Amino acid sequence: TVANSTQLFWSVNEPFEDRNGNTLAWTGIVFAIGSLIWLIMIIIPAFDPAVLQAHESGAIDSNEEVKEFVDYLKPKEGFFITPILVYANVGIFLLMFFMGFGFMSFNSKDLIIWGANYGPLTMQGEWWRLATNTFLHGGFMHLAANMYGLLFVGIFLEPLLGRMKYVGIYLLTGIIASAASLWWNDTVVSMGASGAIFGLYGAFIALILTRVFPKEMGAGFLVSMFIFVGFNLVMGLIGNGIDNAAHIGGLVSGFLIGLALYPSLKGTFKMDGVNEKEESVDEDE
């Protein structure tokens, strides 16, 4: 038997940072894990003495490396969608900032108004929140960590998939991740691109395991992916304010999509990162 009881619910509009603990500590953790990933990417590939000699002799200008990084933020053939997604996420964040909603953190009430995923509203017909919340972030560090992860995976994955497949995976897995978050806890205000980014990482892992990428590249990529994914999932288990349901939903759906795409992508990847098969398709899009 179940006794009748009265339950009272009330909304909590606390700043997003209050659910994330020590912001300074999280800042250090984010950059530490990012540095570790890049270190692994450097150590595992074969060492090239010629490149080292060129650096030591001054033949390679150090400023060129900075210019190369900035160039990654410019839409171009083979890498068009990722910068656009970064601009969209950063643009919305800056708009909220200049309108006075905050910087390091935003209030949950304001995030709901801007389109965050909130069960009582989403399930009453505002299904568009499953998509719009993926372009909102709870604060600066939330945005910075996600954009770092997006650029890292986009550099390698977008040239292989092409524009339509890439943006399709991003949007679809982002919506699935939002639905997973809603299913797990429909009273939480959730937002962020991490579900969609985990979807891209899931697809990336699937293509690494199916040997779409050359063997000499796969080892470094795979270790980096597992460190990034594992770290975030563990932090979601031991910390507050991390939506592991969205992360897992995006990761699993992305992995399955990657497996489904494998037959059409097998043997199309070149070492310079340009996909010949998809290059011709992109020109028609």
Language-model regions: role of each:
Residues 3-284:
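A detector for small-residue-rich transmembrane helices and their helix-helix packing motifs
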